[in-house]
Structures are given as structure tokens and as C-alpha cells.
Amino acid sequence: MSTQTILPVDRETVAALSSRKNEPAWLAEFRLQALEKAATLDYPKLEKTKIERWNLDSYGTHADAAEAKSFADVPAEARGFLNEDGAQDMDNVLVQHNSGVVYRRLNAELAAKGIIFTDLETAVREHEALVKPYLMQALKADEHRMAALHAALWNGGAFLYVPKNVEVDIPLQALFYTDNAQATFAPHVLIVAEANSRVSYMDNYVSGQLQAPIVHNGVVEVFVKPGAKVTYASIHHLGEQATDVTFRRAVVENDGRIEWIVGEMHNGNAASETNSILEGNGSTSDAKIICVGNGEQKLNITTKAVHVGKSSDSQMITRAVMRESASSIINGITKIEKGATKANGEQTERVLMLSPKARGDANPILLIDEDDVTAGHAASAGQVNQEQVFYMMSRGISREDAENLIIRGFLAPVVAEVPNEYLQQLLKSYIERKLGQ
């Protein structure tokens, strides 16, 4: 049973946050109620990981961000994560620096189609009718303590709305950047894609030189209406001082589709859940996730699909590389509810360990309450295949190069799916760095 707990923030701090942001009364009250719930809720229960032993108290305080008048005013280090020279002006981009969004720009052509792409704080005030029905609905504030604390403290974030029958040909992009461990960093991403719309969105979570521990408690909610398709690509590359906890949820209606492409490249402890709730008949999801661990890192990565609709289909691939003394728990969960006839769920989890001290655990889980369905899983955890290494060495390739080629090929199916060439190259550089190359 849960007991009353001392929280990292108090009621006065949360109330002051709402007041400073001039939030509507319903949101101010919602934040306070969430904080009260947090005091009595447990931390999320993760397979084979005691997250409560991690540093989960370093939230800091909200620090107002100075608005950037132009892209050149965005911190130089942050700009470098968006384009190669870090100077070129960019459309369809949003940048959060520590506790608030400092830059947002949507080109006139997309705005004329009714697309909204702005920070969530602004969206709450200017597009309340579009935000209120969805905020903290895919992930409820009373699910666990991390969800409740996020609901009480979220800041900045992104809101993307795509009207019915509108197709967006270019990906929209957000950067969430923290370099101050004393500033609360808890962005919330909310995407609503109306019927028969199409959109690609990608974001990058990065940190500068953090001088003290910090918690990133992030939530992503995606609502895919009938016949719509959303592609969501995300790379996390926070520093060793950061504890990264992220919950991603998509609710997919009839014939809708969600595609997840995720690179978990953290340097500190990290836990993430990427969950597709296939509510509609004919709804589909595809999740491709990679992670690389090194040092003393502890990672818990969960990919999940919940089938509610008939003839729904989920595909999940998770690949992890562990080196040095890193450890990972890789969970794949397919849940098929009663009544979800003709549903199909397939999942694969593979862990590659590069040192004797590295640890990896691949856990395929099938929870099936309906007879007329198909489901499958494959899982493996082990060292680099030495037969492959020897074969390449017999062709004149050194052992080190052979192992590197195998690792790159192992991760390639996800890297190749990132819908932006520069971000794809950035992900490759993160991988090379984490592998010590």
C-alpha cells in the first residue's frame, strides 16, 4: 500500500507556476490535484528494475526562458543539433531551453492549411478547446508517481495539430535542450492528427555540461484519428548527470497508424515506455527502437502494444548494445484484449553484449485474452557472433573493424528510418561516441 511521501516540490511552487504562466483555472487545479495524488502513488513498476533506487528527486525549480527573437538568438550549442552549421535559419522548428520554449517557427504554407505547431503552454491559452480533451488522457495522472509529478510540473513542450485530410510532406522538428541542472526540465509533447491526415514529427533531447544531477520526467501523447498516420522519431542523448524517464503513448482509431522510431542514447540511467493503444478496427503500429549502454548505466526499455480493435496489427523491433558494465532490461509486451478478433502482434528483442561485465535481458511477454488472433515473438541476448567475425577476418578485415561492422548492421534498421538526413547522421555520431569509436 502507498504511504504519504515527501515530494520534491510543494503546493505553493506548483500554484505559483500556474499563476506566472496565466494558465486557465482548470489547468491550475489539475496541476494541484496531480501533486496531491503524487504523494500517495507508487513509482511505476518496471520489469526487473527498482526505479525507486535511482535519483528521482532532482527536479530543480522552474526558470523562465528568454524568448529568442530569431534563430541566431538560440544558444549556439543547441543550434548545432538542428542543422550542420548551426546558423542557417529554419522553419517548422521548436526549441526548448531548460524550462521553457525559446523559439518556434511554422512556415506560412503549413499555417494556411490549419496546422498548429507551437509550445504547449501557448496552446493551452490560445487553443484550449483542442488541448483540454487530450492533455494527460493517454497517460493518466493517477497511474503512478512519475505521471502525477509530470502532470503537476510539465513545462514548455510541443503541441502539433493536423486538421482532417491534411498531409504534411516535410517533418516538423523539436529540440529539447537542458544545460542547467537547477532548472526543471519536463517537456510534454501532444500530437493530434485528425481523420485521414499525415504527418512526421521528430525530436531530439540533449544536454550541455550539467554540473549536478537532474531528472527529465517527460511524456508524449499522440492521438491518431481514423485513417490518419503519424510517424514519430525521437533521439535521447542526455548526459551522465541526467536520469531520463519517458512515457510515450499513442491512441490509434479505426485504420489509423502510428510509427515509432526511437534512439535511446543516454549516458545516465534511463527508463522508457513506448506504448501503442490500438483502439480502432484495422489500426496498426510499428515500433523500431535501439539503445546503447556504456559505463555503469542501467536501462529499462519497454515497447508495448495493446490491441482493442478487430484486425489490429502491431510490429515491434528493439535492439540494444551493451558495453563495459552497462546493464539493460528490454521488454516487449503484446496485449490482446477480449474481442480483438483477427488481431496480429509480432515482436523481436535482441541484446548484444560487448564485454564480459555487460548485462542484457530480453523479455518477450504475450498477454492474450482472445482466441481468434495471431501473435509471435523472438528474443536473444548474447555476445558478438564470432563466426561472423572470423569470416570477415578471413577476408582481410581486422577484428575491431569486423565487430564495428556487425554492430552497425545490428542497429541499421532503426537508424535508416529517421526521417531527416542530418538527424540521422547525428544519431550515427551518438552511436559511434557511445561505442568508444
Predicted regions: what they are:
Residues 2-148, 317-323:
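N-terminal amphipathic, basic helical "cap/leader" segment at the start of enzyme domains
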Residues 109-397, 411, 415-437:
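Conserved beta-strand/loop scaffold segments within soluble protein domains that form the structured core
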